[in-house]
Amino acid sequence: MKRKESYLSSDFRETVALRFPAQAKELNTAFDMRLSALLAENADASKEKQYHLKRQILPGIAAYETLQRVMPKEEALQTVHDYVERLARTSHKQLAALLHIPGLYRLVPGVFVKSTRSVFGPAAGFAPKELQTGNGVWRVDMMKCPYHDTCTEYGCQELCRCFCDSDDISYTGLHPKLIWERSMTLGRGNDRCDFCMKVR
């Protein structure tokens, strides 16, 4: 059975079909070959890290590199940013709608604690340093991140900012009584990502 495509792969195909129809076949082939090579080079990564690599990081790199064949680097970066931003805005809408359920917002910091430990932990290539994880506060410094590390490894560190921005779009202003804070990210050149989600 064919693996379901990442949203980044689908969005890339849509872009080339609409904007570069004459080269669409060639660009899709180039993208597929690059993505296959990236997946092969990272085949020994843990199952936990593969989740992030397959879903976002590697399709993002393949799309970014392939788009540069037909547009300037800055435009390619903005195009991939648009893909990530679109998903983040959808995610924000869904979460905000869910948080209309009375009192549910209080559970959000606790959910962030659990998801950090299960999906964004050392097994996936992250290095979270928990500063506060109780009383309606989730405060974590992320000292290492596979999004940043992989983008840097492939010479496209600037791409990581797309994923950093997606967090801010997804979690800012979810509910009047929830505060999302982050002043630093590895992808924006800082030495850590200082995450905080707390009940007001």
Predicted regions and their residues:
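N-terminal, charged low-complexity regulatory/assembly segments
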Residues: 1-67
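Generic structural motif
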Residues: 3, 126-130, 180
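Secondary-structure boundary/capping signal
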Residues: 24, 75, 178-179
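Unusually extended, aromatic-enriched hydrophobic runs near protein termini
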Residues: 49, 98-125, 173-198
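Amphipathic interaction/junction segments at domain boundaries or subunit interfaces
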Residues: 55, 66-155, 159
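C-terminal non-catalytic interaction appendages of large macromolecular assemblies
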Residues: 136-141, 146-150, 154-200
